[in-house]
Amino acid sequence: MKVLGIETSCDETGVAIYDSEQGLIANQLYTQIALHADYGGVVPELASRDHIRKTAPLIRAALKEADLTAEDIDGIAYTAGPGLVGALLVGATIARSLAFAWNVPAVSVHHMEGHLLAPMLESPQNRPHFPFVALLVSGGHTQLVRVDGVGKYELLGESIDDAAGEAFDKTAKLLGLDYPGGAALSRLAEKGSAGRFTFPKPMTDRPGLDFSFSGLKTAAANTIRQTIKQKGDLTEQTKADIAHAFQTAVVETLAIKCKRALQQTGYNTLVIAGGVSANKQLRHRLAQLMHALGGKVFYPSPQFCTDNGAMIAYVGHLRLQAGESSGLEVDVKPRWVMTELPALA
């Protein structure tokens, strides 16, 4: 089965083709970073318009990359949520229209399930086996999920305010870094020195697996403001030191909660996915954690950490092969709880 996957939930337009026998055979991605850079964040209306312009050309490019025609496609998968409603509608409308025109089934895919299963796109020796604990960490979500199979999910904990990626982006903006801020802050943190600044590790002093990053962001803002008041300005080294301290606090918080989740479930496999899973310090810290616990950690390669069509095509092929399909109506869910998804046998 060859499945065309379409991802348009935010500011990346992704189109890919997954073959149940050959694996990923085409992967096309267009990012809107330059479009939104002047605004310091994603502008939903501009994102939707750009998806309209880019999706069809990327579909043609994916077919060409795989040396296929429309007649070779057996099904279409598209992101139906969560995400920006206008952006989601672009991908869903195109997917439903093509499915009708090509007379193939289409299936809606949960964006975060795509991220969760993205490590399955790796080579067999680098894929996790069920069951495992997943840390989904991105600009919009920070969640710990117990995973017992495809669709067999239990939410163990999540952020009660800002997601980790959102806190990265907002703190980067306070430091005057370019958009996208999270990646810029991580690069700057590599130049920082440990010990000059320290930030709290929120909600680690109490039981539970929920997260809170708004207070950490406020602590960073106060530190920046006080330093400017005392010194008159922020040197590049001071910015790097603040970035290092902030990133360390986030990473340590995530590591502490992951350890608790693994102990609570009794599992010894950890998966990290989502845009922030590309963070080098986070990967290193969680690798240390799993080595100490005698377990294994898995994550997608960097190209599959950010939003992409490959993860949508992969999940779509699983659900289409299981007999799932969506109706002709174009239905998107800007807010969609992953635990509502049907489990596959």
Swiss-Prot record:
SUPFAM superfamilies: Actin-like ATPase domain
Domain of life: Bacteria
GO BP, one annotated term: tRNA threonylcarbamoyladenosine modification
Transmembrane residue ranges: none
Gene3D superfamilies for the chain: 3.30.420.40
Keyword annotations of the record: Acyltransferase, Cytoplasm, Iron, Metal-binding, Transferase, tRNA processing
Cellular localisation: Cytoplasm
Residues where substrate binds: L136, V137, S138, G139, G140, D169, G182, N279
Substrates-to-products reaction catalysed: L-threonylcarbamoyladenylate + adenosine(37) in tRNA = N(6)-L-threonylcarbamoyladenosine(37) in tRNA + AMP + H(+)
Principal localisation: cytoplasm
The protein's required cofactors: Fe(2+)
Cofactor binding: number and manner: Binds 1 Fe(2+) ion per subunit.
GO molecular function: iron ion binding; N(6)-L-threonylcarbamoyladenine synthase activity
One Gene Ontology cellular component annotation held by this UniProt entry: cytoplasm
Family to which the UniProt record says this protein belongs: Belongs to the KAE1 / TsaD family.
Function: Required for the formation of a threonylcarbamoyl group on adenosine at position 37 (t(6)A37) in tRNAs that read codons beginning with adenine. Is involved in the transfer of the threonylcarbamoyl moiety of threonylcarbamoyl-AMP (TC-AMP) to the N6 group of A37, together with TsaE and TsaB. TsaD likely plays a direct catalytic role in this reaction.
PANTHER family reported in the protein's UniProt record: TRNA N6-ADENOSINE THREONYLCARBAMOYLTRANSFERASE, TRNA N6-ADENOSINE THREONYLCARBAMOYLTRANSFERASE, MITOCHONDRIAL
Protein name: tRNA N6-adenosine threonylcarbamoyltransferase
Originating organism: Actinobacillus succinogenes (strain ATCC 55618 / DSM 22257 / CCUG 43843 / 130Z)
Gene name of the encoded protein: tsaD
